[in-house]
Amino acid sequence: TPIHHYMGCSTFSNYTVLPEIAVAKVREDAPFDKICYIGCGVTTGIGAVINTAKVEIGAKAVVFGLGGIGLNVLQGLRLAGADMIIGVDLNNDKKEMAEHFGMTHFINPKEIEGSVVQEIVNLTKTPFDQIGGADYSFDATGNVKVMRDALECTHRGWGQSIIIGVAPAGAEISTRPFQLVTGRVWKGTAFG
């Protein structure tokens, strides 16, 4: 019987061979409905912050998409000591849970005038930084337009945009070269 993989991972089989580093021992009494998230959402979200972006204390960050992975990016940002943590989602019902995970500001792109990029740039300006822009952004949507917005809302000179979301097969992302020439960085990550 063939085993169909998603990103090289399989769990719907009677036996699976994997490296020791990929195994985590859990207590026998650990509730499966809670620990089942550890294998992807938690490690992917927190790992993107800690391992891929290496977010530092005091950073300004944006998370696009507040589902399971996005919430854990928020949690990772809180653990890393980010000061401003902006969540972006089309669903206002996600705001309360996102605040619980560490979000400090919420933007629903359907409820603002103008672009979400300009909204974030304006929100991150300070008296000492009139350019604005997030130090870090994270895409947890898999939407290529959102991936572009995530890059373009980061700060000129040092902004990093981390792509976590998986786009549809064959999809392409694009931006103006100026966005990268001015010091922004696009990175991808899988499983944190």
Language model regions located:
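Glycine-rich phosphate-binding loop and adjacent beta-alpha segment
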Residues: 82, 143-192
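Adenosine-nucleotide cofactor-binding segment
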Residues: 63-66, 78-149, 170
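Hydrophobic/small residue at the entry helix of a nucleotide-binding pocket
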Residues: 44, 69, 77
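NAD(P)H dinucleotide-binding glycine-rich loop of Rossmann-like/cofactor-binding domains
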Residues: 1-64
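Glycine-rich Rossmann-fold phosphate-binding loop(s) that bind the pyrophosphate
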Residues: 41, 65-69, 166
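Glycine- and charged-residue-rich phosphate/anionic-cofactor binding loop of Rossmann-like
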Residues: 27, 130-135, 187-191
